[in-house]
């Protein structure tokens, strides 16, 4: 049996590392960069901002690249090649050691998902309002030229506003972020084991920028969205009933689970 105390020790080590602190700083800055102009609109219009901007922001291809690139940075040292890690490898054996690494990846993916949403809310303080729906600000951005007028770095896709309730979109996005990050971490771990850590990082970087590439190609060839897991963290890239240009949520979940099994 793998002792829970050992797993928690490894997980605590990852969370308290300088690498993770740098990640938190970078993610916080990225959210501030993209969301801060909303506060300017809020101050001018007098409208509060609902706390559901996370799904809209993750559907922005440029933010998605930054978000996934920072996750690659976090996963780049799994497995850790240090002396302590090698000691645990010898002590636990290959199978148990591998299981511990996979559990760590899942925990990190969950923490990153929850932390990123929390940061997106904190960034908007004190302009947050307790609105259970999307609120006026996001509809204003979607239906007017406010995004260009106030130099916003992301749009408010009307496709999302019209097809999803705010909390539904949030839960769906967080679920997809968790699944995609877990797949990314497991894939990088597997590549580093069978090939090298350098190749795993290269794979991660290609994975991180793939939403930008797919966004350009999909205008003429929509089918490429079916083969880009990284693009699925933005629910504007996931189809709904009678929309066959994008993979459905069922297709997405099944594909990620299949990819993850193959990676493992």
Predicted regions and their residues:
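Alpha-helical transmembrane segments
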Residues: 262-264
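Interfacial transmembrane-helix starts/ends
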Residues: 7-16, 95-106
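Transmembrane helix boundary and interhelical loop/hinge segments in multi-pass membrane proteins
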Residues: 72-90
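Extended hydrophobic/aromatic segments used for targeting, binding, or gating
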Residues: 210-237
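Aromatic- and glycine-rich beta-strand/loop motifs that create alpha-glucan
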Residues: 1-26
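Secretory targeting signals
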Residues: 31-77, 99-193, 228-256
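Central hydrophobic cores of alpha-helical transmembrane segments
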Residues: 25-29, 198-212, 228
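Membrane-helix interface segments
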Residues: 20, 93-95, 196-202
